[in-house]
């Protein structure tokens, strides 16, 4: 009381009294660390600030302050009416002369606290899509290497290796040992998965798990950092945590959940004898299908060999051969006309020469005659060459128009179900059966869609 000074020896100011009471509270060793339980009341979350609420039981209530730095460490979302454990100190607020509890930590009360943390984290991660079905990846059919994260001393790794070797001995099993229980288990599990992630290209699938236990024993597999690491793995993950009735957040984030380690190994590996039997069945079906295709193609080839075109191919050339004969006859007649015309000209020149008789004229006419003779010869030769070229072109066209040669160049022609040649899309409707004639056989198909193209 030495520091208390009032305007009168007998009277204290309000501030002096509140200060004195605060000193009493702050110096009391029993009030410096108090473990308190109660029900949250008047709780309204203040984002980014200090939290002010009350704790109550059936008979009493106390005001509580939790500063931002301490509240940020709380691992669950407090809700109105929730029973909690808090630790802190008791002191007064001088400005109002009231005492209140200053909370340093808070957690849900009892075993229900873990269930509440589980529920809240499950809801949070589900909203982020970590458990969404569209993110689940299929397991590889034939894994070369399988990574396993579990205890090195438990029965889990033994069951996995025995089952995998029995079903698919080709697969290599690599153990990444980790603690699966206790306060440091979550960090150990994450560290093991990060080692696998660094070598992700080596492993086809990951199995993570442990044997059965209580909720507290299995809790590391519900920690947020473990669940997020499972979701982030680059290879498919099989989770096998606890018994079949146990469900952890790790199970929900994994691509597949197995009830037991043995079931996890069965998911990760194929049953080799069954696979070999299925391959044998597929081989038999494939051979049957191949034989059927060969038989159909052989029948088509036989039909082609017995067709009109193959038996009498010369009939394809008959009309073209007649055209060649006609062109040859026309060429001969033209040659006769040209020769006759030039002969008449020569006769006229000769007659004129006989009438004129002078040597100079005769010489000139001889030169003209020589020139005309050469011109005639060159003209005849040129006409012959042109007609011969036309004849060769006609023969070549005749050969080009051969259906066999057209088919040999990769073309085909199409007939409908009645055997009529299809020349326009207007002859067809979707669903019609058509036959494609190729150089080495026929193919039967069905019209799916018709697209008409207009040529300008």
From Swiss-Prot:
Coiled-coil intervals, chain numbering: none
Chain ranges passing through the membrane: none
Enzyme class: hydrolase
Single GO term (MF): nucleic acid binding
GO cellular component: cytoplasm; exodeoxyribonuclease VII complex
CDD domains: ExoVII_LU_OBF (cd04489)
Reactions catalysed, as given in the entry: Exonucleolytic cleavage in either 5'- to 3'- or 3'- to 5'-direction to yield nucleoside 5'-phosphates
Record flagged with keyword Manganese: no
Entry EC no(s): 3.1.11.6
Recorded superkingdom: Bacteria
HAMAP family: Exonuc_7_L (MF_00378)
Name of protein: Exodeoxyribonuclease 7 large subunit
Phylogenetic placement of the source organism: Bacteria, Bacillati, Bacillota, Bacilli, Lactobacillales
Gene name in the database record: xseA
